[in-house]
């Protein structure tokens, strides 16, 4: 086993090679949305492009380079069609006649009003060999050369980048023939994702249909009405109220608008604020011809200068450009500029509308992707840039053989110790009792829904049914609740819970009934998890008024886990051999605040298994430096779990206390890392785990296996045989595994679709092994991973990622609620705004610190 020293920098970090292919499971014929790319054995020439003035949007840079190639055709470019990435990289199939010299050119673009001149210099960088890439794909080289993959990526994206609106790795075009409004001035645009990926023997182009939210190009007045729910602008005869103005400002700040009062000159501006005063009162210093300045209102100015009598002088103005420049525009002369993507978090309603508009059954998605690729609008078609480099993209999906892994059996308890066998990723608890059920003797009910919504008789009926189901499940709730009262508002949570803790000795659980979305939830979890250390179970009032055995049974799953029970365990004899010695499973995740929320910190969570099943887990959580303090070097460190040494150490100590064993193996599932950052994140984290071990005992060196779990990718798998499709949505069966054809040419990775798809097309999780002291075979690791997907306590189904990785996400998400500052925040919806309102790092750290009574429980279940 290798010792991890500070060792090589991340750039030299070599992940383990694939230990062979898996063989377990029933073969299944599949199609993947990867399209084979034929590349010639040629050299490609890489040039650096420097455009002044700098910091122009990529779209402008592309126009500049496009114009330059046409304009300097005779002298320099000839018939070459360079591929260009919109920043600094340009590739040609034949060298330019400039040798290694730098060449400077001037390019003029027709601008709004006046032409714009750019200075462009082009300089040779290197020769990129596609021959080397082909050798790597055939498995003859240790590493796939990044520079050739990058060159291919730029060349294949060149044409779509000119034709469509690029967003990340996807391309979108304005809606034609469909309209999916999301409300709040937003709408759905459909497009496609495209990325070049090295695979076994071939380069592949991964193509998927995608959708995202854009702002609708419309007059600002209409936008404002949508945001503020104003039915008819003519009914808005008064100025906006403060709360209306704040809401409107939040939505429009940062957006680009264009003016309509100057004829063809549609100048564009970025909004920085909304004025407090209406246009009839908002003044600015108007420069007179005699050099003096006089205060003039915006409404007056528009009347004098443009003979424009404002229709809505009582509405505010947009302040645009730089704050200090005081440029004001009345709402009625502005439109939203087309093609702006919405980066702010969607509301819950918008999200659900978006899902309804975009969810496609697997066969429909397969059909849509195939149509897209064959329609020539994208790849395969007459793309002069691909032709220039001799690149051919096949237009048929890649066929491959996967395997459907056998599902593990699950052991239940009670008198008859039943075993459940999942079918299609699902099993049920009927006639089964928990492996270890907790007896609940002292419990309380707090109802935050109003009495008229949730009458006492309904409450009583709910608690009676809950007791019946809990008894059937082997988690008997003995007797009526010791306390059952109505309450109102988040402010009453803390005093009530304190009273309960003082009054009822041995109180095990508080069941809290919530009236829909409410700040009460965040407060219940803050008080229960961090302040008093009490187990709480929230229930939506709709589930109390109309109960179903399924809902009650699901509540019992969560309650039993929170109170230290064990719902079920993997039947021991079928587990992989890694269980023959003490092993700890760690799950880790770093979650960032939604875009546009610079004030909030990132949260790192690490959980660890605490028994041999593994079923019980403990959590550790930390607040990390927030996004605005980022320089390029720090960009990766922000993705790294910064305090991992102390977190891993805590979990190892706790494992020892729980089991009296020291783990000889550590299996670490890491969620939330993007592909480009994997190696930079893995290296410091591996060292941190090693340090944690050595800090416990100088020669304590358990074998570490480090696996990145990714769900945010665009690989989709489809059944080649219609008869094998499963369920209404026609997805691949749960347990479908792929480790060849579309996977990495030499590294240890695989796709596993461990869950049964319910809505839309299943997204297989992608697993990449970045370190493996434990020398897993492909079969062992794939089976282990699949079995861990069956151990998630919240439901009786196999989930899409292993339980430890899932729990780490839950812990981080719960910490967001702990950070909600109830005096400043509306914890509205799921986008909890855990404002750090100037709270210092110590205060933030304290806010997520779990109470010692709760610390070693599964409070996050």
UniProtKB/Swiss-Prot annotation:
It comes from Mus musculus (Mouse). Keywords: Cytoplasm, Ribonucleoprotein, RNA-binding, RNA-mediated gene silencing, Translation regulation, Ubl conjugation. This is Protein argonaute-4. Residues 509-820 form the Piwi domain. Residues 825-846 are annotated as: Disordered. CDD domains: PAZ_argonaute_like (cd02846), Piwi_ago-like (cd04657). Belongs to the argonaute family. Ago subfamily. The gene is Ago4. GO terms for biological process: male gonad development; male meiotic nuclear division; miRNA metabolic process; miRNA-mediated gene silencing by inhibition of translation; mRNA catabolic process; negative regulation of apoptotic process; pre-miRNA processing; regulation of cell morphogenesis.
């Amino acid at each position: 086993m290798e010792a991890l020293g500070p060792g090589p920098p991340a750039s030299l970090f070599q992940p383990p090679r694939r230990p062979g292919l898996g063989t377990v499971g029933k073969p299944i014929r599949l199609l993947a949305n990867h399209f084979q790319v034929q590349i010639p054995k040629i050299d490609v020439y890489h040039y650096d492009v420097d455009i002044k003035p700098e910091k122009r949007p990529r779209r402008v840079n592309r126009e500049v380079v496009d114009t330059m190639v046409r304009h300097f055709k005779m002298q320099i470019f000839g018939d070459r069609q360079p591929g260009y990435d919109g920043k600094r990289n340009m590739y040609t199939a034949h060298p330019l006649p400039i040798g290694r010299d730098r060449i400077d050119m001037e390019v003029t673009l027709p601008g709004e009003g006046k032409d714009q001149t750019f200075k462009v210099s082009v300089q040779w960088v290197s020769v990129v060999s596609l021959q080397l890439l082909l050798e790597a794909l055939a498995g003859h080289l240790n590493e796939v050369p990044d520079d050739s993959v990058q060159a291919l990526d730029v060349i294949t994206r060149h044409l779509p980048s000119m034709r469509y609106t690029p967003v990340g790795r996807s391309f979108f075009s304005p809606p034609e023939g469909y309209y999916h409004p999301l409300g709040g001035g937003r709408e759905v645009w459909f497009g496609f994702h495209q990325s070049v990926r090295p695979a076994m023997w071939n380069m592949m182009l991964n193509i998927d249909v995608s959708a995202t939210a854009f702002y609708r190009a419309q007059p600002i007045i209409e936008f404002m009405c949508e945001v503020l729910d104003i039915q008819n602008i003519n009914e808005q005869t008064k100025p906006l109220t403060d709360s209306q103005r704040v809401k409107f400002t939040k939505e429009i700040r940062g957006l680009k608008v264009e003016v309509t009062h100057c004829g063809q000159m549609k100048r564009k501006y970025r909004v920085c604020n909304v004025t407090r005063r209406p246009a009839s009162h908002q003044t600015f210093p108007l420069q007179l011809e005699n050099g003096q300045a006089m205060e003039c209102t915006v409404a007056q100015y528009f009347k004098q200068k443009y003979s424009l009598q404002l229709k809505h002088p009582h509405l505010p103005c947009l302040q645009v450009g730089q704050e200090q420049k005081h440029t004001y525009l009345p709402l009625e002369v502005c439109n939203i500029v087309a093609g702006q993507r919405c980066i702010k978090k969607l509301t819950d309603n918008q999200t659900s509308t978006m899902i309804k508009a975009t969810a496609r059954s697997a066969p429909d998605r397969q059909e849509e992707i195939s149509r897209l690729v064959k329609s020539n609008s994208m790849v395969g078609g007459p793309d002069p840039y691909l032709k220039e480099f001799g690149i051919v993209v096949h237009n048929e999906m890649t066929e491959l053989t996967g395997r459907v892994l056998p599902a593990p059996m699950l052991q239940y308890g009670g008198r008859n110790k039943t075993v459940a066998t999942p079918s299609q990723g699902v099993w049920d608890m009927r006639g089964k009792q928990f492996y270890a059920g907790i007896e609940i003797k002292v419990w309380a009910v707090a109802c935050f829904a109003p009495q008229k919504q949730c009458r006492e008789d309904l409450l009583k009926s709910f608690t009676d049914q809950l007791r019946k189901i809990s008894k059937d499940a082997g988690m008997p709730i003995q007797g009526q609740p010791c306390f059952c009262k109505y309450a109102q508002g988040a402010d009453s949570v803390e005093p009530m819970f304190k009273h309960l803790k003082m009054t009822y000795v041995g109180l095990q659980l508080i069941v809290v009934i919530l009236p829909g979305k409410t700040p009460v939830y965040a407060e219940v979890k803050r008080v229960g998890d961090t302040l008093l250390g009490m187990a709480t179970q929230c229930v939506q009032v709709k589930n109390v008024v109309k109960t179903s055995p399924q809902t009650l049974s699901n509540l019992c799953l969560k309650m039993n886990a929170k109170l230290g029970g064990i719902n079920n365990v993997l039947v021991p004899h079928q587990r992989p051999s890694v269980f023959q010695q003490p092993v700890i499973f760690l799950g880790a995740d770093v979650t960032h605040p939604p875009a546009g929320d610079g004030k909030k910190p990132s949260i790192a969570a690490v959980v660890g298994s605490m028994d041999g099943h593994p079923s019980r887990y403990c959590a550790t959580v930390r607040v990390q430096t927030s996004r605005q303090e980022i320089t390029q070097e720090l960009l990766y460190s922000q993705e790294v779990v910064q305090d991992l040494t102390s977190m891993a150490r805590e979990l190892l100590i706790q494992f020892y206390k729980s089991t009296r064993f020291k783990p000889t193996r550590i299996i670490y599932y890491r969620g939330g890392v993007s592909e480009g950052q994997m190696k930079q994140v893995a290296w410091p984290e591996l060292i941190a785990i090693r340090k944690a071990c050595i800090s416990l005992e100088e020669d304590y060196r358990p074998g570490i296996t480090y696996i990145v779990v990714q769900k945010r990718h665009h690989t989709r798998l489809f059944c080649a045989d219609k008869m094998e499709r499963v369920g209404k949505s026609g997805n691949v069966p749960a347990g479908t595994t792929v480790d060849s054809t579309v996977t990495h040419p030499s590294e240890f990775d695989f796709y596993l679709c461990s869950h049964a798809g319910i809505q839309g097309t299943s997204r297989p999780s992608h697993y990449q092994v970045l370190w493996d002291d434990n020398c897993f075979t492909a079969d062992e690791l794939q089976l282990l991973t699949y079995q861990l997907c069956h151990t998630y306590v919240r439901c009786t189904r196999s989930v899409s990622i292993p339980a430890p990785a899932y729990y780490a996400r839950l812990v981080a998400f719960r910490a967001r609620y702990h950070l909600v500052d109830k005096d400043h925040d509306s914890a509205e919806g799921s986008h909890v705004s855990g404002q750090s309102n100037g709270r210092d790092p110590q205060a933030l750290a304290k806010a997520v610190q779990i109470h010692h009574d709760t610390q070693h429980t599964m409070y996050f279940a």
